[in-house]
């Protein structure tokens, strides 16, 4: 797989977030502490830090140039070919973006694996919308589906998310991607349900594989996702499914 080396992508329209300007914090290669079986990027050895990344100055200059060209940007989305919170200057970058963003919101798309680290936790508190993945609760599932780097202390993730949700004044969204025969068993779903009710996010997006995955794994059905959504009580659930047969929304119209 080839990578573009471009820091900026978009702006692109997002049904949930409006016009999004994407920022790739690892444009040259995949750098992630997970090697998820369903990843749309090629499989790669996990890492615990980035060794190749753009400077804060270059990123800010790219954003400023985009603002000159595109006058209607609703959200700046921090992402990566991998895990964006591995970017070593994340806090500095967020501070600099917040100086220039005016009314534009900030969004980060993270696998949630580093939220228990104080420097990451504190940096995420400064972002308007934090979207974290939570595919598994059990250690066995994390190792089998998300194939985590040995540096990740998975048992600390959910407690940190619970605390973060209580502390943040902004929006916390969770995402669960279900994979057939991996995290679709009743025991794991019950653990997820319990954790989500403790975390109390603004919304939970549930979905499955809809692009060619890195490894030979299969999606679950839409009907399965409907069943899971009905099991998640007292939670705003959004089913994300390509060519979904019908609309199923349990969140209110003013949700993000």
Located regions from the model:
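Canonical Radical SAM [4Fe-4S] cluster-binding loop centered on the CxxxCxxC motif
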Residues: 16-57
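Conserved AdoMet/S-adenosylmethionine-binding subsite of the radical SAM
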Residues: 86-220
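Short, basic/glycine-rich phosphate-binding loops at helix/coil junctions
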Residues: 40-43, 72-75, 137-141, 172-173
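Glycine-rich beta-strand-to-loop/alpha-helix junction loops that act as flexible
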Residues: 77-83, 111-112
């Amino acid at each position: 797989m080839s990578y573009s080396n471009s820091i900026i992508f978009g702006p692109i329209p997002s049904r949930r977030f409006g016009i999004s300007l994407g920022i790739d914090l690892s444009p040259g290669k995949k750098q992630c502490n997970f090697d998820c079986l369903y990843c749309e990027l090629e499989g790669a050895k996990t890492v615990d830090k980035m060794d190749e990344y753009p400077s804060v100055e270059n990123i800010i200059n790219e954003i400023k140039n985009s603002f000159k060209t595109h006058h209607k940007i609703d959200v700046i989305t921090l992402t990566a070919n991998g895990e964006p919170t591995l970017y070593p200057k994340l806090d500095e970058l967020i501070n600099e973006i917040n100086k220039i963003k005016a009314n534009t919101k900030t969004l980060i798309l993270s696998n949630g694996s580093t939220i228990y680290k104080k420097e990451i936790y504190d940096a995420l508190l400064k972002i308007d919308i934090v979207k974290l993945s939570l595919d598994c609760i059990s250690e066995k599932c994390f190792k089998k589906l998300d194939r985590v780097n040995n540096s990740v202390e998975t048992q600390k993730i959910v407690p940190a998310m619970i605390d973060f949700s209580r502390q943040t004044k902004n929006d916390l969204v969770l995402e669960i991607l279900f994979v057939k025969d991996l995290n679709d068993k009743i025991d794991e779903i019950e653990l997820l349900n319990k954790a989500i009710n403790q975390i109390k996010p603004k919304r939970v997006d549930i979905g499955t594989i809809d692009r060619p995955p890195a490894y030979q794994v299969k999606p679950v059905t839409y009907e399965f996702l409907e069943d899971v959504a009905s099991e998640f009580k007292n939670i705003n659930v959004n089913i994300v499914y390509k060519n979904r047969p019908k609309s199923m929304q349990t969140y209110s119209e003013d949700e993000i």
